[in-house]
Amino acid sequence: MIFDPPLQSGQLVSRYKRFLTDVQLDNGEVITIHCANTGAMTGCAEPGTRVWYSTSSNPKRKLPHSWEIAESPAGHFICVNTARANQLARELIEQDALAPLRGYARLRTEVKYGEENSRIDLLLEDDHRPACYIEVKSVTLLDEREQAGMGYFPDAVTTRGAKHLRELMAMKAAGHRAVLLFMVLHSGIVRMRPAAHIDPHYSLLIEQAITAGVEILCYRPHVGVQSMVAQDFIPFESCHLLPEGSE
């Protein structure tokens, strides 16, 4: 994924009303840009943070600019535009860059499914194997106190994410393949686990999903201000495998 036209940069002034962000440009001008991320954005949205934003050519947009990248105090690049996770996952699957998801004849997006009025992010289909239902989640939360690059999901309580896990378990029970794909969009994260300290219910549901046969994949693309490209999978640490008292 190449950012075209190239991203422009500035300094974060404030994020407010969830979707709005004020950015000061190098010439001193302050502009308001759109923020697609509705999460807590812990460690990504401190005033003074260096940010990069894209510009839409759509004249009907009220806010033509969108916040794409933040640079952490440690120099890590973080893609904060949650829509990019789905876009990049689709690109990588179409490029056969994600080995566990290769070999399907068709890929569809936003297909209605399940019993809770859901739409699956990605649906892989083939005439010779069960369909593969993929929910994509964007991971940007790094615990800066840890030196081992531990990332967490979610960064806030997520009832929507819980619904998606229930739907995936139902698809698996119906004989399909079900995958929870974490797209790790923080260059400082090298492994991850459920954020039981933030959303214990979601963490419990992940354990139930694993037991039910839902696959957990964590993929970390290379995140930069010019592009995001294929890199590697990273380990996922299930909470029930952690030593007692480690949370």
UniProtKB/Swiss-Prot annotation:
It comes from the Bacteria. One of its GO terms (molecular function) is DNA binding. InterPro entries: SfsA, SfsA_C, SfsA_N. Gene3D superfamilies: 2.40.50.580, 3.40.1350.60. Belongs to the SfsA family. This is Sugar fermentation stimulation protein homolog. The lineage of its organism: Bacteria, Pseudomonadati, Pseudomonadota, Gammaproteobacteria, Aeromonadales. The gene is sfsA.
